[in-house]
């Protein structure tokens, strides 16, 4: 009797249901760790694989159920995490033997943040320089000239105080010199020495300087200076002695 295709598919499905999804070769590799694994049959390995699948399925369902209860109805879909497995082992006595295997992983409180640093693109610096250059080109020349004038005006006030101070000092020194020169005594008539001559130009310059000084002095100061000059003028004693000697001789002749 030939089997139909439907019967073949049903038979294959039964075989798949009876065989575990976990590979038998991996189960045997784990079983060989035990020195007595030589006496284990293939059917025992198959049964162990089925038991492992059922255990894993039950453990995962319990962990997801506990996570759903803790979160409530915030999220419809849940993802299996290590924390959910740890809570399941802690809350159920059936899985206490897994405490040494399933452990809570503590995350560092402060992360260094090095992984967050992102490298700059290669052309980013060049693009920024090109933007700055284009912005400078867009600025008209009139605005640039106004900026230069503003800079000059800002620097001028710093230079003005020094110039004003120098001018004030010069004015004060000139006024002091003019006052001191006005209070000088009248010079005595010095005898003329042969061979020493004074040019007319020097005399004219001195007269002009004296006139300028007299113009700068106030009228009241000028009157005071004239009185001082009169008091300081000393009479020539030689002339007085000659006059007195002439008078004595005339009186002697008359006698």
Curated annotation (Swiss-Prot):
SUPFAM superfamilies: Histone-fold
Compositionally biased region (Low complexity): 171-184
A molecular function (GO) term: protein heterodimerization activity
Keywords from the UniProt entry: DNA replication, Nucleus
Disulfide bonds: none
UniProt keyword Acetylation present: no
Compositional bias annotation for Acidic residues: 135-156, 199-219, 236-255
Gene Ontology process terms (BP): DNA-templated DNA replication
Chief place of localization: nucleus
Classification via InterPro entries: Histone-fold (IPR009072), Transcr_DNA_Rep_Reg (IPR050568)
Compartments where located: Nucleus
Signal peptide start and end residues: none
Residue stretches in coiled coil: none
Ranges for region Disordered: 109-255
GO cellular component: CHRAC
Complex and partners: Heterotetramer. Consists of four subunits: POL2, DPB2, DPB3 and DPB4.
Function: As accessory component of the DNA polymerase epsilon (DNA polymerase II) participates in chromosomal DNA replication.
PANTHER family: CHROMATIN ACCESSIBILITY COMPLEX PROTEIN 1, HISTONE-LIKE TRANSCRIPTION FACTOR CCAAT-RELATED
Miscellaneous: In eukaryotes there are five DNA polymerases: alpha, beta, gamma, delta, and epsilon which are responsible for different reactions of DNA synthesis.
Name of the protein this chain belongs to: DNA polymerase epsilon subunit C
Species in which this protein is naturally found: Candida glabrata (strain ATCC 2001 / BCRC 20586 / JCM 3761 / NBRC 0622 / NRRL Y-65 / CBS 138) (Yeast)
């Amino acid at each position: 009797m030939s089997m139909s295709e439907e019967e073949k598919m049903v038979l294959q499905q039964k075989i798949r249901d009876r065989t575990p999804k976990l590979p038998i070769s991996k189960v045997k590799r784990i079983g060989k760790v035990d020195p007595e694994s030589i006496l284990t049959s293939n059917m025992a390995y198959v049964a162990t694989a089925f038991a492992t699948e059922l255990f894993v399925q039950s453990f995962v369902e319990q962990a997801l159920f506990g996570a759903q209860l803790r979160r409530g109805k915030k999220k419809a879909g849940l993802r299996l995490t290590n924390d959910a497995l740890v809570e399941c082992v802690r809350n159920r006595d059936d899985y206490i033997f897994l405490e040494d295997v399933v452990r809570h992983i503590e995350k560092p409180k402060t992360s260094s943040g090095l992984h967050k640093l992102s490298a700059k693109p290669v052309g980013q610096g060049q693009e920024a320089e090109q933007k700055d250059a284009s912005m400078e080109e867009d600025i008209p020349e009139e605005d640039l000239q106004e900026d230069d004038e503003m800079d000059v005006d800002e620097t001028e006030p710093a230079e003005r105080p020094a110039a004003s101070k120098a001018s004030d000092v010069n004015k004060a020194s000139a006024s002091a010199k003019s006052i001191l020169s006005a209070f000088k005594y009248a010079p005595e008539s010095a005898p003329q020495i042969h061979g020493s001559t004074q040019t007319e130009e020097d005399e004219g310059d001195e007269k002009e300087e004296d006139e300028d000084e007299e113009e700068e002095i106030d009228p009241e100061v000028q009157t005071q200076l004239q009185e001082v000059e009169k008091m300081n003028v000393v009479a020539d004693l030689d002339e007085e002695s000659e006059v007195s000697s002439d008078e004595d001789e005339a009186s002697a002749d008359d006698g």
